[in-house]
Regions:
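Active-site rim beta-loop-alpha module in soluble metabolic enzymes
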Residues: 127-183, 188
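Glycine/small-residue-rich loop that forms an oxyanion/phosphate-binding "nest" at active or ligand-binding sites
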Residues: 57-111, 115
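Periplasmic-binding protein-like
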Residues: 8, 71-78, 174-183
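C-terminal alpha-helical cap/extension of soluble enzyme domains
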Residues: 24, 30, 36-43, 50-52, ...
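Short, well-structured alpha-helical segments in soluble
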Residues: 54-70, 160-174
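N-terminal beta-loop-helix "entrance" segment that forms/cooperates
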Residues: 37-61, 150-155
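Short, glycine-/small-residue-rich phosphate/pyrophosphate-handling segment
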Residues: 16, 107-145, 158, 213-249
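N-terminal beta1-alpha1 ligand-phosphate binding loop
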Residues: 4-28
Length: 249
């Protein structure tokens, strides 16, 4: 039996971040799946806030629509999970957001977990997410660093030191598992885990392993319920999306 193919899409346009995402994704997939990693060709260099998220999601939809080979699942490689619901309507395969996947794994693997984020991470948003998922009692909180998302492209030791400092604060407050609110925090995670001494979950790895788990349970196209398109209609422009949008993919 052929291995499934997981399409991992970075909604931003950063080549450096996409390369890091690809490394983590392949490591997580192991022998269980093939990985194809792509990035948005149009949109912001990094995603920081709602406007960037919408622009990045639009670019991501174009990338998925233009990909001409078959794939069995899509992983959205941004912790805010932009465009996940739209992609679930566009394609007929499981679509996994790395943010939701990370929360799920943390809930299973720890008693209490926390999130270390770049400066754009908001405690209110993540508190709302954990409440909606029913895991709020396990959530220690959000530890916001002064780092921009683009800083994670750097090999500057000061970046890792800053992440470690905030991770240590979270551990002191009772977290025995840490998430990181950016897919770009990838290559640094093992060092952080060693220095802090608690489990650190790479968000991209969580997304890929969740996709593999979904494929083991569900192979039929996802067409009903929340995946049902209400009315067929023509699509003007967005040529790369037409075959998926009209159900011909």
């Amino acid at each position: 039996m052929d291995k499934p193919t997981i399409l991992v899409v970075n909604p931003n346009t950063s080549e450096e971040m996409t390369a890091a995402i690809d490394r983590i994704a392949w490591e997580a997939a192991g022998a269980s799946a093939n990985v194809v990693t792509r990035r948005s060709l149009h949109g912001p260099h990094t995603i920081e806030g709602p406007l960037d998220a919408v622009l990045g999601a639009a670019g991501m939809l174009e990338v998925v629509g233009a990909y001409s080979y078959s794939f069995d699942a899509v992983v959205v490689a941004c912790f805010g999970d932009p465009g996940v619901e739209a992609l679930r309507l566009l394609v007929r395969v499981p679509v996994i957001g790395i943010g939701a996947a990370s929360f799920t794994q943390a809930a299973f693997l720890s008693q209490r977990f926390a999130i270390v984020t770049p400066t754009v991470g908001t405690s209110e948003r993540y508190a709302t997410v954990t409440e909606a998922m029913g895991i709020a009692p396990q959530f220690v909180g959000t530890y916001q660093t002064p780092l921009a998302v683009a800083d994670f492209e750097s090999a500057d030791p000061a970046v890792v030191n800053t992440l470690v400092f905030h991770a240590q604060q979270a551990a002191k407050d009772g977290a025995d598992c840490l998430l990181f609110g950016c897919a770009g925090i990838a290559d640094q995670i093992r060092e952080i885990e060693e220095r802090v001494g608690v489990l650190c979950i790479p968000s991209v790895a969580a997304g890929v392993t969740q996709a593999i788990a979904c494929l083991r349970h569900r192979c039929a196209p996802l067409v009903g319920g929340p995946f049902r398109r209400v009315n067929s209609k023509p699509l003007e422009g967005f040529n790369s999306l037409v075959r998926h949008y009209e159900g011909r993919a």
